[in-house]
Amino acid sequence: LRETAEALHSLLAGEAVTFRDYPTLASYFNFNPDRSFHLHFDSKTPTRLYCGGNRPLAMAVGGEFMDGLLFGGEFKAVAATGRLPSLIQIFDDAAKAAGKEEILPKLAQVKLSVSRDREAAREFARVNAGRRILGMRRLGFTSEDIIKLGVQPEEVDRLEIANREGASPHQFGQLVSDTMLDAIFIAGDPGYCRERILEERETAHQHGFRQLKFSELGPDPKESVRLLCEEIIPAL
């Protein structure tokens, strides 16, 4: 993450880079470490690099070397665990220690699935939500954190077993409760989603986020984008 940010900042500033100075990138992408690279165009406007990691080390590196924070798809759940303020503090402290005087911009990603067909919207998001709950455990969130989401650890154990045994998406999804789904996603019809997004906006605002980013959207992308633009965003 650090090498990517440093290399991109140099390239966008019109400088040439040699990947011997970035050994991790050279090894991972199989770059020739002795070749020099530069962009064949000038960056006409400032390009911000946003940190997409949301664990402590990524937050520290992002605050020091990047220009903003995009807190990913577990934003809703992490906020519910109570861990969000301490993670943001790591990011802000690292930025301040690096000499950045202004608070860096922050975006919160909201997992959304909206449709006139409420059940279709919820089923579309179910497997994704379950996999993200599993991911939170693997990233170090504790049983106590999971319980704060209204989910029991043994429910996550069942997901772990199903995933390990190669369950189909349908089989896996049957193990994902509505509580798990709602811990990660805002999923349902436009009226329901609008009210939940207004609540999420307030949570984001309280923690210093000034912009929401929506992902997934729903089972029918065209319908979901239309509903988002016409029936949800105007309320924001």
Model feature map: region roles:
Residues L39-D42, D67-G68, G208-Q211:
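Short, surface-exposed connector motifs at secondary-structure boundaries
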Residues L1-L39, G82-Q206:
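An alpha-helical appendage that flanks or caps ligand/catalytic pockets
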Residues S10, G63-E64, E202, P234:
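Solvent-exposed polar/charged
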Residues G188-L236:
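Long, low-complexity C-terminal extensions of enzymes
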Residues K76-G82, S113-V114, I186, L217-E223:
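Acidic-and-aromatic substrate-binding clefts and catalytic sites of carbohydrate-active enzymes
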Residues L49-G52, L69-F71, L104-V110, R210-F214:
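Hydrophobic faces of well-ordered beta-strands that scaffold small-molecule active sites
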Residues M66-D67, R126-V127, E230-E231:
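Short, solvent-exposed amphipathic alpha-helical segments in soluble enzyme
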Residues S43-A95:
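Loop-centered beta-sheet repeat module
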